[in-house]
Structures are given as C-alpha cells and as structure tokens.
C-alpha cells in the first residue's frame, strides 16, 4: 500500500489533510496472475477498494455479450469447472488457502502444500494456462448458464484474455513495493492467521519455517530482473531495507508482533494442555529466530547487493514496454474500455467539476470558507463511529444483517511503513470474523470517521458481507477487480462527509468535493509520472497550481507513484467509474432515480469490471422505469 503524503497543504484557500485513506482489501498480489504465469507466490489476501470539459459520456461501452438469454437454473458443469479452478488456485500457497477457507475439504481442496509459494524461474513467460482456460470457458453455451453464471463467465473471460495479452511483461512483476510489498504484509498476514484447531497451529509453524526459502526464491527472481535492468531505484530499495530493518528490531522480542500475537491467539484455542501451549510457544520462537529473522536479513542483503543495477529510472514509461505495462495495470484493475488518454481527460474534467461545485457553494455562502477549518465529525471512538455509520447509511444503502468485527491496531514496528487503515476479509466459511486495522501514526482521531466508512460501513466490510449473501461462485472472491473494490470504498468514503453532524449541509458538501479533488490530483500525478514521463519537478509544477507549495510533498508523491504504479488510479478511477454510472442512471431515470436502488444494483452485481457494470446497467434502468 502506498504511504500517502501527510502534510497540510492549501487547496482552493482551504486547509485539508492530503492523506488518502487506503485499505488493504485487494491490495493483493493477483493470485490468478501469479498462478497462471507459473510465478506462484504468496497472495496478499486482505479479504482482508457528467464531465465539464465537453468529453462524451461513456454510455456506449464495449459489449460483453450479445444476448441476455439465460437459463433458469445453474449449469452444473460450469459450476464444477469454476469451483475446481478455485480449488486449484488456492492450493498454490497455504496462506492464501487458509485466508479464504477454514475447512478446505468443504471446497473440494484435499491436497495442498504448506508453502508460501514460489516463482517458477524456469518458465516465467509460460502463458499456456491462460489459453487453456479461455478455450474451456468459450466451450460453454452461454444460453445454458444462469444469469449469475453469465456474470462469472464474463468476468473470467475478460480477466484471462487481458492477462494473456500482456503475459510477456512478467519482468515488471515485483512484490517489493515500498508500502504494499510482501515484506510489510507478511507480518500482518501471520498476525491474522486464524487458529481454530491444532492443525492450524502446526501449519502456521511450518509456514514460518518457509520464510527464508520464500525470500531466497524471491531474491533469485529479483536478480533476474536486475540482470535485465528492471530492479528498483536505489531510493526505493533504501525504503524497503529500512522497513525490513525496523521489523527485525522487534521480530524476536517477547512483546514483538511475531511472538506476542502468536501467544495471544494460542490462548484462545480450545483443547490445548499447558504442555501443548509451552511446546508451541517454544516452536514459534525457534521458527522466528531460525527462519523468519534470517529470511528478512537475507532480503536486506539481496536488496543491498542489487542496488545500482537499475538501468532505468522514473515512471514506468521510461522502461522498455513500460507504457504498455501501465495500460495493463489499468485494464486489469478497472476493466473499462478506455485509453489512458481518456482516463487522463476524465480526471481533468472531474477536477473541474469538483472545483466548480466548491466555487458554487462558496458563492452561495461566503462564510463557508471561514467555517471550513472548524469541520469535524466530532467522533473519535472506532466502535461508536461504525455504529453511527451503520445507522446513517440506511436511507442510501440496502440493509444487511449485523456483522461481527474487531478493531485492531498496527504494531509500532510497522506503523511507518503500512497504510492508514486496512480490512481483512473473513474466510468464506467463517464470515463472522472481520478485522479492521488502524495505523495510529497514519490516521488521526479526527480522520477516523471517513477512514472507517472506507473500511467498514458502507465500504469494504459492508460490501464483502453483502456480496457473500448473494451466494456468488467462489472464483469471484479471487477475481474481485481492484477498481471495483477500492473504487467503491473511495466512492462511499467521499459520501461519508455528508454524514458529518456539523449542522451545515453546504459545509459537508464543500469538504467532500475538496477531498474528492485531492484524490483526483493524486490520480493525475500517477498517470503523469507513469505514462507521460513526468519528472519530480513536473509533479511539483502541477500540484503547485493548486496550492501545494512544499517541494517535499512533490518528492514523496513522485516516489509513491514510481514505487507502486497505478495504485492511486485504482482508487480514484474506480470512484469516478461509479460516479459515471450514477450520472447515466440519473440522466435516464430523472425523478424515478433512487440512490438506494442504484447502490443495490452495484452491490448485487458484485466486484466486476466496469464494462460489465455499464453493459448490465441498461437492463436495470429499464426495470426502474
């Protein structure tokens, strides 16, 4: 996850925190991509994300299908196929498997290796799995599939065809982004590894013993990238090294995350004798000291040795085929038939729209600018905030049953390197365990309300629980395009400003529009650096037009864009995609438009590419008329 700039900056004569609250939901290495490219590695399962410049509206999207004819019942052959595919993919590594399911056999998974996964260094460019799956999917007669299965088919085909088209770009793959990288995520994954029975503990210990081998394999792949000049810039390598060293300082301590969290979880497992507990504690300490710590140290050594090997610098477009890889990132996460140039124009027009909205509000009431600095949600308790959000969203979002969740805090050793907040989705057969992590150093108490709207209600936790209740094909939990998942969470986060109890609706709208504008500035910079070749100075010149007059802000933004290309776009372009869908529905339904019903349409569809959302919107609009 990207570490967002945390400075106060003037925008439109208004002070605003420029930090975008990003969650870990689907900040994940794509399991399908890793598995099918024979570069299998740990899936980061955070199951725990009308234009004013004259641009045409995207109503005429690429059609996913030519017919809406569907069967009244599920096609059992198709169900069997996609369930087997789900089982094959999850069997690739144990952490992914355990994160998604508590009882693998109930999902047809009877054979799996207890491993964190490995890159296949001998065949990194093998794309045969893509072609095989595409061929099988196309062999199904679409008219024999139920409506739900047709969505699964469309989503799978779109994903596989996109991966096949760009499968030659494997050299860009890395798991060592400064704040979304596996070196940061792994301790959190281990902390959230559920212990329900002794088998879970045994497998957990075995996974700890695989950390050094896992990083050794990763080092070999990074060496391959370095030999071709694709290794990260020294500035980024230094950041990763620093975060690894920070983890190493406390990893083996009694009160460190790897020891204390394990001991806490151990105490909650039924049926363990005092001797069992003592033995497991000793095994954990041994595994951490003999495998986890040496593994992280070897990662530091590898990064240090490869510094200076990078032949290129700056955004992706400065690398051979880098612009094409950026196109792949947007296509993969959004699935929206737009070119990067069109996305860039969409961001520009959205900035204009939000700024005009703020100007209009200020013209109606000039005192609103003076009141802006006093804006507050007046709530700081996480549980109280989530309770309040659950109550306030009922007019705009369909209700779901009560959800059990736990509020947790990122360990001190990881605070400087992880995102402001994150949501871990529950196992599919254990939906009552939901965890929301808060980074105390990345999120102030005054920012918790929109942060928890993003992570909880009506963001990730709400959307995850709603989707699970629709009984989707299991494979869709893995697919879950980031543009939908993070776009939804960002979209509702902006809406949450309307729930602030300021007694001034105009002020709430002003703050929401201001925040949305800042998000768009980040997406603009992401595109600028990675597709148009902006330098750090270009970033500064651009943001200085909006009052960002501190060059250190531009510096941090620039390296955030370089470290994790497309990550901001996933949030912001996804958010704008939902805004465009809403605008189309409002335009065609006029006074018959109902916001709650619109949100239900989005939620009923579940995480899919935006082309699929647009393609199915007309049928929903027809029902609403």
Place the predicted regions along the sequence by residue.
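Generic detector of N-terminal low-structure segments
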Residues: 13-16, 37, 48
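N-terminal hydrophobic alpha-helix used for membrane targeting or insertion
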Residues: 26-27, 45, 443, 449
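Bacterial N-terminal signal peptides that target proteins for export
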Residues: 26-43
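Intrinsic low-complexity/disordered segments
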Residues: 1, 25, 30-31, 146
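Short, Lys/Arg-enriched N-terminal segments with co-localized hydrophobic residues
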Residues: 3-23
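C-terminal motif of bacterial Sec signal peptides marking the signal peptidase cleavage site
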Residues: 51-54
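N-terminal maturation segment of proteins
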Residues: 57-625
């Amino acid at each position: 996850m990207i570490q967002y700039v945390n400075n106060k900056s003037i925008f439109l004569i208004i002070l605003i925190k420029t930090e975008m609250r990003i969650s870990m939901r689907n900040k994940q290495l794509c399991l399908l991509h890793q598995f099918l490219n024979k570069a299998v590695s740990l899936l980061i399962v955070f199951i725990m994300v009308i234009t004013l410049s004259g641009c045409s509206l995207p109503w005429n999207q690429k059609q996913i299908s030519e017919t809406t004819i569907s069967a009244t019942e599920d096609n059992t052959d198709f169900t069997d196929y996609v369930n087997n595919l789900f089982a094959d993919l999850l069997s690739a590594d144990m952490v992914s498997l355990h994160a998604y399911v508590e009882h693998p056999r109930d999902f047809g998974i009877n054979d799996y290796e207890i491993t964190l996964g490995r890159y296949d260094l001998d065949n990194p460019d093998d794309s045969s799995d893509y072609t095989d799956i595409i061929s099988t999917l196309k062999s199904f007669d679409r008219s024999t599939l139920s409506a739900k299965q047709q969505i699964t088919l469309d989503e799978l085909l779109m994903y596989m065809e996109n991966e096949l088209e760009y499968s030659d770009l494997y050299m860009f793959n890395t798991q060592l982004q400064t704040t979304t990288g596996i070196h940061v995520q792994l301790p959190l994954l281990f902390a959230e590894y559920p212990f329900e029975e002794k088998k879970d503990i045994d497998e957990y210990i075995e996974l700890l013993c695989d950390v050094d081998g896992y990083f050794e394999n990763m080092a070999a792949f990074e060496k391959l990238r370095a030999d071709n000049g694709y290794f990260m810039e020294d500035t980024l390598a230094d950041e990763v090294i620093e975060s690894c060293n920070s983890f190493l300082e406390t990893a083996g301590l009694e009160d460190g995350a790897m020891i204390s969290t394990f001991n806490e979880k151990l105490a909650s497992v039924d049926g363990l004798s005092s001797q069992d507990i003592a033995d497991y504690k000793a095994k954990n300490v041994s595994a951490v000291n003999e495998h986890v710590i040496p593994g992280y140290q070897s990662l530091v050594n590898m990064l240090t040795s490869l510094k200076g090997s990078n032949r290129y610098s700056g955004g992706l477009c400065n690398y051979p085929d880098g612009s094409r890889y950026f196109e792949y990132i947007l296509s993969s996460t959004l699935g929206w038939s737009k070119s990067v140039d069109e996305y860039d124009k969409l961001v520009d027009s959205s900035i204009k729209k939000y700024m005009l909205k703020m100007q209009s509000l200020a013209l109606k009431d000039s005192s609103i600018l003076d009141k802006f600095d006093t804006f507050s949600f007046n709530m700081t308790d996480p549980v109280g905030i989530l309770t309040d959000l659950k109550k306030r969203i009922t007019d705009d979002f369909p209700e779901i049953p009560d959800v059990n969740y736990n509020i947790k805090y990122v360990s001190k050793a990881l605070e400087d390197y992880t995102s402001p907040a994150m949501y871990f989705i529950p196992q599919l057969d254990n939906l009552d365990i939901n965890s929301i992590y808060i980074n105390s150093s990345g999120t102030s108490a005054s920012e918790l309300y929109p942060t928890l709207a993003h992570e909880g209600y009506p963001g990730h936790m709400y959307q995850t629980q709603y989707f699970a209740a629709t009984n989707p094909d299991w494979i869709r939990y893995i697919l879950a395009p980031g543009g939908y998942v993070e776009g939804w969470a960002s979209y509702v986060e902006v809406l949450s400003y309307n729930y602030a109890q300021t007694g001034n609706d105009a002020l709430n709208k002003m703050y929401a529009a201001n925040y949305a504008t800042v998000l768009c500035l980040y997406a603009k910079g992401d595109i600028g650096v990675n597709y148009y070749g902006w330098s750090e100075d270009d970033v500064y010149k651009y943001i200085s037009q909006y009052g960002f007059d501190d060059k250190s802000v531009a510096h941090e933004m620039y390296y955030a864009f370089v470290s994790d290309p497309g990550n901001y776009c996933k949030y912001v372009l996804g958010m704008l995609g939902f805004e465009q869908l809403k605008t189309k529905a409002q335009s065609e339904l006029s006074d018959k438009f109902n916001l709650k019903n619109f949100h239900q349409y989005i939620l009923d569809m579940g995480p899919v590419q935006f082309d699929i959302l647009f393609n199915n919107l007309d049928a929903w609009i027809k029902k609403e008329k």
